[in-house]
């Protein structure tokens, strides 16, 4: 049996120190959000994961610079809508530090960059190449490609919205196969997601979010569970995941996403002309 895995924050840098440059009067919203992420990192670092987990990647750690760049650039004010993914993919956020972070979109549309370090443990079949990764993440290309077409400029999307993952960790089997949180042993899965749920509550309250859109069924379910009973109430809805493993998504995810956003009344928020607010 493989030894249980923990993931250190890493001796190569100290991301917390990067937050020690406060604004003259008070910390920014982005700094507060990053501090919450570092708090979550510290809590998750105490967990151990037995088989089937072989290696754990935490891109909020080793891809700290582009991740901080993303948050600092696009989380400057309150957000009405949070699009919530589940956890990083091996060719998206695991490479770039950005949720659904397909390399070309991150570099060419979001304009996010920065050095990506080598994880403390790196699986030979899943090397971390940062923005030099030659493989495109289909989910991320679909997700951000849709909003690029709809919004035109990133500033239009991020005026009211933000994108975040519930869990910052990527789990790999000894073979290098991606393991979703749903595939973890029940006890470890619940420990992990309970901590992430609590962090989500704090993050939603910090940003002033009124609507969480879970991208995929599991993200939606966890958000409903985590945010039940919050005051003021936070609405939770779902959006089909753009995964290539989804037959429904492969039939036309962009059309399905547009229809769903229309149902939720979000399209006006995502265009230059729109000034409506979600109900």
Swiss-Prot record:
Top enzyme category: hydrolase
UniProt keyword annotation of DNA damage present: yes
Binding site for substrate: 86, 100, 165, 241
One GO-annotated biological process of the protein: base-excision repair
Annotated compartments: Nucleus
Cross-referenced Pfam families: UDG
Keyword DNA-binding carried by entry: yes
Primary localization: nucleus
GO cellular component: cytosol; fibrillar center; nucleolus; nucleoplasm
Domain of life: Eukaryota
Enzyme Commission designation: 3.2.2.-
Protein keywords: DNA damage, DNA repair, DNA-binding, Hydrolase, Nucleus
Residue ranges, annotated region (DNA-binding): 175-189
InterPro entries: SMUG1, Uracil-DNA_glycosylase-like, Uracil-DNA_glycosylase-like_sf
An example molecular function term from Gene Ontology annotations: single-strand selective uracil DNA N-glycosylase activity
Function: Recognizes base lesions in the genome and initiates base excision DNA repair. Acts as a monofunctional DNA glycosylase specific for uracil (U) residues in DNA with a preference for single-stranded DNA substrates. The activity is greater toward mismatches (U/G) compared to matches (U/A). Excises uracil (U), 5-formyluracil (fU) and uracil derivatives bearing an oxidized group at C5 [5-hydroxyuracil (hoU) and 5-hydroxymethyluracil (hmU)] in ssDNA and dsDNA, but not analogous cytosine derivatives (5-hydroxycytosine and 5-formylcytosine), nor other oxidized bases.
Family in the record: Belongs to the uracil-DNA glycosylase (UDG) superfamily. SMUG1 family.
Name listed for the protein in its UniProt record: Single-strand selective monofunctional uracil DNA glycosylase
